[in-house]
Swiss-Prot record:
<protein>
    <recommendedName>
        <fullName>S-adenosylmethionine:tRNA ribosyltransferase-isomerase</fullName>
        <ecNumber>2.4.99.17</ecNumber>
    </recommendedName>
</protein>
<dbReference type="InterPro" id="IPR042118">
    <property type="entry name" value="QueA_dom1"/>
</dbReference>
<dbReference type="InterPro" id="IPR042119">
    <property type="entry name" value="QueA_dom2"/>
</dbReference>
<comment type="subunit">
    <text>Monomer.</text>
</comment>
<dbReference type="GO" id="GO:0008616">
    <property type="term" value="P:queuosine biosynthetic process"/>
</dbReference>
<keyword id="KW-0671">Queuosine biosynthesis</keyword>
<comment type="similarity">
    <text>Belongs to the QueA family.</text>
</comment>
<keyword id="KW-0963">Cytoplasm</keyword>
<dbReference type="GO" id="GO:0005737">
    <property type="term" value="C:cytoplasm"/>
</dbReference>
<dbReference type="Pfam" id="PF02547">
    <property type="entry name" value="Queuosine_synth"/>
</dbReference>
<keyword id="KW-0808">Transferase</keyword>
<dbReference type="InterPro" id="IPR036100">
    <property type="entry name" value="QueA_sf"/>
</dbReference>
<dbReference type="GO" id="GO:0051075">
    <property type="term" value="F:S-adenosylmethionine:tRNA ribosyltransferase-isomerase activity"/>
</dbReference>
<keyword id="KW-0949">S-adenosyl-L-methionine</keyword>
<dbReference type="GO" id="GO:0002099">
    <property type="term" value="P:tRNA wobble guanine modification"/>
</dbReference>
<comment type="pathway">
    <text>tRNA modification; tRNA-queuosine biosynthesis.</text>
</comment>
<dbReference type="InterPro" id="IPR003699">
    <property type="entry name" value="QueA"/>
</dbReference>
Length: 346
């Protein structure tokens, strides 16, 4: 398929630069199969969830992954931690006038010292000195890495608003943004209705913002991210399917974790590992029936994912409606509910 099939015109004013004033107050476009588009608010989500349905959340937590400093040679440097390997070692994207050489010392804010000890592709392996762990150093001295389309520096408000209320495990460099709309009160309402909540972990990497640079999407190489599906979640999903209930993925990262864990057999299995799953039109979904997601960038892999899930024509119509009604787009923007289109050619 051609990348131009996933392009659309988006007025710049619709790109949300700040979160809504109150968490959970965003708009919700309900775009389920076989029903007209509905303009709602996010607090109406329980209206579409049945007792016994399972909602699967990604419990990853965004690290303060951006560090500023200088090389021992004096040049300025910026590091974005992509993955923590152990208590003192991490892989990082490096921005500098010249790439650091193996063995070069780096000094970051707060007196953090690190040494480059190798490379893995475009990533540099950094070994941090001192007794504190990488996570502790980042929490004390790092900066929250907002997406590139948010054209401002992170502030104190982002420290809480760019995290979900259920975030547990550090490791992401970008938030699972569909989850940003959920409040504790809404989670209680869903449970009171009889919905089941379950969790996966997928540490969102910087590759989520990587543009597709090829004309034919089949030639695109997807980035890899670490994920885990606990046994309790696999059991909850299988039980829901057995009784005829729906499985909801809260966000594309939850969907990618679930579908990755079902790749081998077509049934969800507990486990962990790295995934580079690339979901495009023609993909056969094994787990997810409903998807809560934000609005995605033109020509992005996530727009391809939702097009695979609900059908390209359906997504085009929904996005055209969203632009006309001036929904807010991307990480701090509004949300939509999508259903799996069983009529999609697979």
């Amino acid at each position: 398929m051609d990348i131009s099939d996933f392009d659309f015109t988006l007025p710049e004013k619709l790109i949300a630069q700040h979160p809504p004033e109150v968490r959970g107050s965003s708009r919700l476009l309900v775009a389920l199969p076989d029903m007209p588009l509905q303009d709602r608010v996010f607090g109406d989500l329980p209206d579409y969830v049945e007792a016994g349905d399972v909602l699967v959340f990604n419990n990853t937590k965004v690290m303060k992954a951006r560090l500023f400093g200088q090389k021992d040679s004096g040049g300025r440097i910026e590091a974005l931690i992509e993955r923590v390997l152990d208590n003192h070692t991490a892989l990082a994207h490096i921005r500098s006038s010249k790439s650091p050489k193996p063995g070069m010392g780096l000094v970051f804010e707060g007196g953090i010292r690190a040494v480059t000890v190798g490379r893995e592709g475009e990533l540099f392996c950094l070994r941090f000195e001192g007794g504190e762990t990488v996570y502790e150093l980042l929490e004390q001295n790092g900066h929250l890495p907002l997406p590139p389309y948010i054209e401002r520096a992170a502030d104190a408000d982002d420290d809480s608003r760019y995290q979900t209320v259920y975030a547990k495990y550090q490791g992401a460099v970008a938030a699972p943004t569909a989850g940003l709309h959920f409040t504790e009160e809404l989670l209680h309402r869903l449970k009171d209705k009889g919905a089941v909540t379950a969790e996966v972990t997928l540490h969102v990497g910087a590759g989520t913002f990587q543009p597709v640079r090829v004309d034919k999407i089949e030639e695109h190489k997807m980035h890899s991210e670490w994920f885990e599906v606990p046994s309790e979640t696999a059991a909850a999903v299988e039980a829901a399917k057995a009784r005829g209930n729906k499985v909801w993925a809260v966000g594309t990262t939850s969907m990618r974790a679930l579908e990755s864990a079902a790749r081998a057999t077509g049934r969800l299995k507990a486990g962990q590992g790295d995934t580079d799953i690339f979901i495009t039109p023609g993909y056969r979904f094994n787990v997810v029936d409903r998807l809560v997601t934000n609005f995605h960038l033109p020509k992005s892999t996530l727009l391809m994912l939702v097009s695979a899930f609900s059908g390209m024509g359906h997504i085009r119509a929904a996005y055209r409606h969203a632009v006309e009604r001036e929904y807010r787009f991307f990480s701090y923007g509004d949300a939509m509910v999508l259903g799996r289109n069983e009529g999609v050619v697979r």
